[in-house]
Amino acid sequence: EFPAAEPQEAVAHFLCRLSVETDCADVHHALVNHEQDFILLHVVGNPEQFARRHVPGALHLPWRQITAERMAHWPADTLFVVYCAGPHCNGADRAALKLARLGLPVKIMTGGITGWEDEQFEFASHTLVSAS
């Protein structure tokens, strides 16, 4: 019913997709081999959830809090890799859209937390310190 795309059309499609996506294995490889050329953003949840479990090296910046002022802390050519809870969550898409609208390079880490867990990669955690 749906014939395969012509090879050149398939190449264009996959190049386009890979220009806006990465996966858990590629992010893990970059982290363990000290080849990280991106800022990893955990874009959903609250600080307590992030403290309990997140991808090592990630910063917690919920997508609703992404603003030009916040992102001005990084050089304009910084690549951001965003992730959320998993395929059932659209937080990474929302974050990526906001970052792209700000003119910043961005990719989504497909799979998110669920994908990271499925790959059996280790999570980071830390204890929150109360201000009181």
Regions found by a protein language model. Name each.
Residues 47-50, 90-91:
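Short, charged/polar "capping" segments at the starts of alpha-helices
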Residues 69-117:
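Catalytic cysteine-centered active loop of the rhodanese-like fold, especially the PTP/DSP P-loop
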Residues 59, 77, 123-127:
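Short, hinge-like loop/turn segments at secondary-structure boundaries
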Residues 61-69:
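Glycine-rich, highly charged phosphate/nucleotide-binding loops
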Residues 34-40, 56-57, 79, 105:
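Short active-site oxyanion
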Residues 27, 58, 99:
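Terminal peptide-recognition signature
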Residues 1-48, 125-132:
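Flexible, polar/low-complexity N-terminal or interdomain linker segments that lie immediately upstream
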Residues 50-56, 116:
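Short loop/helix-cap segments at secondary-structure boundaries that form the rim of catalytic
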